[in-house]
Every structure is written in C-alpha cells, then in structure tokens.
Amino acid sequence: IGLNNGMYYTCAEGWQRYRGFARIGMRYALVMVKNPEKPVFLQKFGLRSRVRASAALGAFRSDDYLLNQIYDMCRHTHELCVEDTFTDCPTYEQAFWIGDAQISSFINGWVCGDYDFLRHNIEIGATALKNTPMMNALTPTDWNTSIPMWAFNWITAIQEYERMTRDSSLSSRLYPTIREVMAYYIGCMDARGGLLINGWNMLDWAALDIHNNCVVTGQQALFAYCLDYAAGLAEAAGHSEDAVLFREKALVLRRYIDKVLWREDVRAFADGWTPEHGLSKTVSTQTNTLLTLFDGILDPEKKRITLGYIEREPEAFIRAGSPFFLFYVYEVLVAQGRLKDVLEDIKLRWGEMLRYDCKTCWEVFPGFYEVSRTRSYCHSWSASPTYFIHRYALGVERAADGFDGIRLHPVDVNLGWCEGSIPTRHGRIDVRWSREGGKTRYHLRVPVAIRVDAEQMASCELIVERI
C-alpha cells in the first residue's frame, strides 16, 4: 500500500537495458538524471502496456457524443483496474478492496461477462476473514483494517454473481464463511438491537456525523439485507436453525432503525447513534439511499417520507460525496423511473473529468480536495456509468437468473438512437433502438435459450432475431 509509482536505476558504464519489475500506472513519465559525471544518452524509452485478457462482449454507442465519451472513459478505467483481481487503481495503491470490488463486479458482469473472473474475486475476498472476523477491508495484506460495509458488499457481490450466472455452487461452498461473518456481526448487536461497531464506519467520502464507535443507520439496513440473503442460503443448505436466527436478527435490526434512529424533529432518519453523543446531528442522502435500496424501513409512513426525500433532496441533507456512493443513489433513482435524470447527472459529473482532458475516471469529483483535483486519477469504483448505461439504457431487463429470461421495455432517455451488446451465459444479446417519425423501432438479436417478454413493447415496431 502506498504511492509506488517511481523507480531508481544505477547506471553502469556503456550501453545497457533495463525493464522494471513493478507494474506502474501513469499518464506521464518524468526521467531525472542525478549526479552524472559525463553525458547520459537515452537510445530508447518506452512503456509496455498490459491488461488482463477479457471476453469484452459488451458494447455501447448512441447519438449522444458526450455519453459515448464517458462510456469509453469508464470502460477504459475498468480495464486498467483489472489485474489478477480487481484493484482500486493502477497507481496509488493497486489493492484489492473487497468493498470496491462489488461495484467492479457489477460493471464486469454486465459489460465484459468474465464470469470465471468474478468467481475468482469472490473466492479471494473470502480470505479477508483470515485477518479479522470482521473481514479485512482489503486482502491479501498484513494491514489489518476493517470497514463493515465492505464485508457486506462482498456478500451482495455473491448474490449478484448468482443472479448473473445462475451458479449457486459458489454460495454453497462459501456458506460456512458467510455464516461466520454473520455470526460475528450478530455478536456486535447491543441489547436494543443496534449494530454497534468499533471500527472504520465508512459509507462515503462526506461529512457524515458518524464515528468509529457508532451504530450507522445505513450499515444497519445493509446488514439486515445480508442476513435475509444468508437465511435463504441456510435454508438451501438444510441449516434451518441458522435461517430462523438470521431472519429474527434482521427483523430486530429493522425495528431498531424504526424505533431508535428516527429523528422526529427533522422527520428523517439520523445518520447514526453513539453511546457518547446520542443521535447524529446530520441527516443525509446516503442514509436514505441505503435504507431504501436494502429495504431497511418497516413503518409505511416513514418509508413514504424517505422516498420523498430521495425524489427531492432537502437543502439541509448531506449529498453523495463520491462516485462510489452515487452507484447506490443511481440504483434507487432508476428504480423510481428516473433513468433520464441519472444519465444527465452522469454527463454533468463525469463530463467535468473530460473537461480536464482525462482519459480515466477520478476517485472523487473536482472540488473534493482544496489543493488538488483528486488523489487517484484512475479509480475502478468511478467506472459505474458503464454499468448503468448497459443495464438500463438499452431497454433489456434481466427477468430471470442467468438471463434465462429477459423483459423488453421502452426507454425514457434523451437519445434518438442507441445500440449495444450485453454478455450472458447463453451468448451475446445485441440491441438497437431508434426513434424516427414519432415511432420507436427496436431490433433485438438474442440467443434461442433466452425467453423474451415483449408485452411492454406494443407501441414499438419490434424485430426479434433468434441466434
């Protein structure tokens, strides 16, 4: 871990050649010659570029030039952050953070279709349990640091892998590890049902009033969601007692959210609670997003109020501070039928990176740091626009695990036409749609093994070609 993007070479007499052993990420290279006793001549200086081989079956193109540029920038970023595992960046750390890898796996599944590689990353992620029962935030490493949300992200990545591939063998084999993680965090619940964690309680790079010894509201909802998923795995494996326990604890967690973490003075859920300070002073989009996305609210009225805050953010709420957390915000907005808003926001925020003539996505947005634009200029968690474009703008919805079935639907976005390809375990789906003369024309090439539901396409001119 560290900024290891330089090297020293001590010259001998005469012509010689040298190739560095360490992988270095860069856009520009600076050569410095120190203390020469005579002129130094460079005959050749170059870079040897290398990325992991990929199926790379996905593609996208549209009549929106800026959106195309952003898609290419994000896809290139993802490719540069793929080594023997997903890494956060090719320069600053080159580390396999298991929370970052969740977003990378969603991107790769929809854009590249490297399913064996997704499985490999999940298996490597399981080794994070060797450092600490909380799961280390990155692995393999001797730096012991845990972020609870990263452990829960590893579990949701397993769930998405199953949905992409219909392969349940991985979750079955990893169930003992999942059970161990769930049991540890259940042990962190206090008498009232709060997940009181003493650790790095990070949700986002933003000024949330949460502490290292804290019940974090969004984290509480995500843990309840993971317990429900683990209960399903337990039932499938014949561990009925585990399933009952996990579901009971998930309900306790949600009741705690409802009874303890609601701030009646602002009619919103607090970002957290600490034994020293009580309820947090801040309320945020981050908390509302995780509560909504992971079904953390029991009370129907509080759920309605929270959805209203997502539809129209109050001024006093803290906004998402990083490309990382916008992944979750965008998922909720798309579920509300606001894909058009999501794509326009992507063009605004990622378009700002393009204005600086960048070819890759930054870790944070311009303005986050006072004295620099960003820390990492090529960061995998910032490549999620490729995922949203692929999954939602093409009008193809996965209707069954493993893409055994898909559902077609018209797309409400500011595009005149777009085309693209989606990888599946049955083969590639090719899509092209356009709006001409007030009519939407939709052309689909789809493997014969995939069922197609086109009930929502009655107003469109539809051609389905089986391959």
What does each model-identified segment do?
Residues 1-88, 100, 116-117, 121, ...:
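Extracellular/oxidizing-compartment recognition motifs
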Residues 280-374:
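Extracellular polysaccharide-recognition and catalytic grooves
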Residues 29-34, 99-128, 155-168, 286-297, ...:
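Alpha-helical support elements that line or immediately flank enzyme active sites
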Residues 1-4, 112-212, 348-369:
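Helix-terminus loop motifs that line ligand-binding clefts
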Residues 36-43, 65-67, 110-123, 129, ...:
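Structural helix-adjacent loops and short alpha-helical linkers that scaffold large soluble proteins
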Residues 5, 11-14, 83-85, 132-153, ...:
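The feature captures the catalytic groove of carbohydrate-active enzymes
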Residues 74, 104, 167, 223, ...:
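Conserved hydrophobic/aromatic pocket- or pore-lining residues that grip, position, or stack substrates
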Residues 236, 255, 340-467:
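Non-catalytic C-terminal accessory modules of carbohydrate-active enzymes
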